[in-house]
Amino acid sequence: MDILWFIPTHGDGRYLGTNTGGRAADHTYFQQVAQAADRLGYTGVLLPTGRSCEDPWITAAALASVTKNLKFLVAVRPGLMQPSVAARMASTFDRLAEGRLLINVVAGGDPYELAGDGLFISHDERYEATNEFLDIWRSLLKGETVSYSGKHLKTENGRLLFPPAQQPHPPIYFGGSSKAGQETAAKHADVYLTWGEPPHLVKEKIQSVKKKAEKEGRTVRFGIRLHVIVRETEKEAWQAADRLISRLEDETIAAAQNAMKRMDSSGQKRMVQLHQGNRSNLEISPNLWAGIGLVRGGAGTALVGDPETVASRIKEYADIGIESFIFSGYPHLEEAYHFAEKVFPLLPFRTKLQSKASGEVIGNDHFPSRQKEKTV
């Protein structure tokens, strides 16, 4: 089991939809979150991509030098750069960070945003271009000389002179709920990612991608992207969830939902269907809460509960085939501690803690006793 955290390069705070309790999205704060994740033993961190975020490559490069074990799941956007340039960037980062790069291939799901970036192709054409991009990108990182002529991309005698630390290339994470997205994942992904839907829907996706990968003669691992709200008791956790959206105005929700309607991402449409923009009945599956998706694009669901309950829900996903979990929570610094301290001991997750927790010395003479953690 791998557990990753999240660097909030699009902003952070105690409440959604308001600047009250907000955090500065700057290098100092990103470094705090990254170093906390590193010290707590998270496998890595995801950095989001898009016009609402700081650039993930520059941010990850800045954070790699101030962390030790933490891996960085960084987005590549086919169509916005040539595969040869992306291959050189990936190889350089992976060497300088000593094998700590993971690649998140993002085809894009907002035609309005993509047009602003100069990309004017349809949903299915984006996946065609992504397939061609990854054909070239993977071959270059394997050390091959590449000549390629496709519908969208062409390369003549392309070479990568300096190989990455990880062979044949840094692991590829890929998400896509549509038929075209799943077929692309089956051909190229090492880890297929889904947003946090109820387990029975996630299981359907896993089965579908597995079948498609088998036809390609490949095996694919599976991951899930979720938020988390964990507290000592169920009551406290649900109160924290309610507080998170307590300052959301109806106009803010309506504006966010209208923006999501223009998107042609199948995964985003599935997220919206879970709550329909309605504040009521947000617990869409036991302990799976869709409140964040009222205003946040992309991952919009959270596991909510006490440590034992949240660990049990994670195990339910693991039992259907999920191996990689990418979590986040508001605010991201505090929630990284909440989750690691309360839930890690209950999971089959081997952390690389940089220092052992000790607690405060008692009476200037005794170390605190170690309590045996429950397992789920």
UniProtKB/Swiss-Prot annotation:
Q: Which GO terms describe its molecular function?
A: alkanesulfonate monooxygenase activity
The record's listing under Pfam families reads: Bac_luciferase
Q: Which reaction does it catalyse?
A: an alkanesulfonate + FMNH2 + O2 = an aldehyde + FMN + sulfite + H2O + 2 H(+)
Name the InterPro entries on file: Alkanesulphonate_mOase_FMN-dep, Luciferase-like_dom, Luciferase-like_sf, SsuD_RutA_monooxygenase
Matches recorded under SUPFAM superfamilies: Bacterial luciferase-like
Give the EC number: 1.14.14.5
> What CDD domains does UniProt report for this protein, alphabetically?
Alkanesulfonate_monoxygenase
- Top EC category: oxidoreductase
Q: Please give a single GO biological process term from the UniProt record.
A: alkanesulfonate catabolic process
Which keywords annotate this record?
Flavoprotein, FMN, Monooxygenase, Oxidoreductase
- Bilayer-crossing regions: none
Stated family: Belongs to the SsuD family.
Q: Which PANTHER family match?
A: ALKANESULFONATE MONOOXYGENASE (PTHR42847), ALKANESULFONATE MONOOXYGENASE-RELATED (PTHR42847:SF4)
What is the role of the protein in this entry? Catalyzes the desulfonation of aliphatic sulfonates.
In Swiss-Prot or TrEMBL terms, this protein is called: Alkanesulfonate monooxygenase
Organism of this sequence = Bacillus licheniformis (strain ATCC 14580 / DSM 13 / JCM 2505 / CCUG 7422 / NBRC 12200 / NCIMB 9375 / NCTC 10341 / NRRL NRS-1264 / Gibson 46)
